[in-house]
Amino acid sequence: MAPKINKIVNGPIPDSFLADETKRLDSLKFDGQRLEVLDQLLLPHEFKYIPVNDVSDAFNVIKSMQVRGAPLIAVVGSLGLLLEFNKNSELNIETIREKIEYLITSRPTAVDLRNSVTGLIPILETEGITDDEKLAKCQEYLLNVYTAEKLQNRILLWNAYQELLTAFPGKEKFTVMTICNTGSLATVSWGTALGVIRALHSENRLNLAYVLETRPYNQGIRLTATELLHGQVPFKLITDSMAAWAMKNHQLDCVLVGADNVARNGDTANKIGTYMLAVLCKHHNINFYPVVPFTTINKNISSGEEIKIEERAASELLRVNGVLVGNSECPVWNPAFDVTPAHLITKILTDFGNWSPAALEEQIPR
């Protein structure tokens, strides 16, 4: 799905922008034939890449959260399908449909995965071409999911960076806050919200980033802190419950978050705790920005009421690194995501331009 306007804000993008690739971690390794993904459950203590050979492997690493982040799981799901096609050249449309639906169930809230793999269906339904031609087109499409994510991510980060410069004219350095992990470990490039923080740092415009630990899966302390330490980016780690006090006492300029699903009206589903930050931003008069690829915007739903929220196992809340930290009989509610209403959002920053939620829907093709 492409918007009506393809806009690079204040372009062209200089070659120097985020040019130093050694400053970021690699979430996967892919040479066209073999795929290995970084097992993020082992971070920060061990860096281990594990093979993904087919759809079943892709499902397992996504479901278990060995890989996570909306853009990354879309790529891993797509490459899993590609490797499946490479192993088995027999094109059975019903079997492929089943594999697509199977992949989607691995993380049902994440619309990027759904959008990416269901993009095969129009190809499969094309009339007047042979099965071999359909297979070739499917393989080309799935590979493009991977290559396009890299290209569009750079545009996304440039657009978001330019929005901050425009929203805060004359400001030399920014103090920001983020939740979860939205960096290179959530994408195949620099990231979304955390990528903007990396861009600010690379341009010498970052004062400090406050990073929420992000319970119960601890993506902030395990993943985001690991990325920022690797890139020598100034940050402070805080617990989720410290966010309000940090906003009151440390003159934040904005909160930058990612998203797994954005409705047509701008309602935004993201990691649990994001809604809390948006409410706090409203109270403290702080700008609140989801930073998302346009593929995360779901043209099929009108509001956040239609977003399915994944609920995960009680053990994820009761255990840390496998160690039981509470009574195993505790009743638990563990939603993985929440939905931030559009009226709490300053702008949604995308690779096709930056819009207020009210203006966003006008850009979405029907």
UniProtKB/Swiss-Prot annotation:
Any one GO molecular-function label of the UniProt entry: S-methyl-5-thioribose-1-phosphate isomerase activity
GO CC aspect terms: cytoplasm; nucleus
Main location: cytoplasm
Similarity comment: Belongs to the eIF-2B alpha/beta/delta subunits family. MtnA subfamily.
PANTHER family, per database record: METHYLTHIORIBOSE-1-PHOSPHATE ISOMERASE
Enzyme class: isomerase
Subcellular location: Cytoplasm; Nucleus
UniProt site positions, description: Transition state stabilizer: C180
SUPFAM superfamilies on file: NagB/RpiA/CoA transferase-like
Name of the protein in question: Methylthioribose-1-phosphate isomerase
One Pfam entry name: IF-2B
Role played: Catalyzes the interconversion of methylthioribose-1-phosphate (MTR-1-P) into methylthioribulose-1-phosphate (MTRu-1-P).
Catalytic activity: 5-(methylsulfanyl)-alpha-D-ribose 1-phosphate = 5-(methylsulfanyl)-D-ribulose 1-phosphate
GO BP annotations, alphabetical order: L-methionine salvage from methylthioadenosine
Keywords (A to Z) from UniProt: Amino-acid biosynthesis, Cytoplasm, Isomerase, Methionine biosynthesis, Nucleus
